[in-house]
Amino acid sequence: MFYELRQYQSLPGKRDELARYMEEVIIPFQVSKGMVVTGSFTGETEENLYVWIRRFESEAEREQLYKAVYGSDEWKNEQSPKIGELLDREKIVVSRIVPMPKSVLH
């Protein structure tokens, strides 16, 4: 099992709109495709920061879920263009992280 820690920088003044779109559209859509989202956050002091975490049981599951989400017409035609208006794609940081054996997330 592993997690993706995904950090996004909104375009200036767009963080609240980005967070709302993630919470109301992107996350529910991805969950409907089988994605497990374990948390989402905004930066307390970083005014443009939005962070979310997804969990995968295996690389095979991640590949299957990526295909289901990012290969869909809804993602390609609606969500991806909209999200591009809200965040700086060049500043996206995705870290794959593995919980330690004693972590409650293990």
Segments from the language model and where they lie:
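Short coil/turn motifs at beta-sheet boundaries
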Residues: 1, 45-47, 87
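Specificity-determining recognition surfaces
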Residues: 98-104
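Accessory recognition modules or surfaces
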Residues: 7-8, 43, 48-63
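Short, structured motif recognition centered on aromatic/hydrophobic residues
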Residues: 2-6, 18, 29-30, 50-54
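Basic/polar N-terminal segments that are highly enriched at the extreme N-terminus
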Residues: 1, 105-106
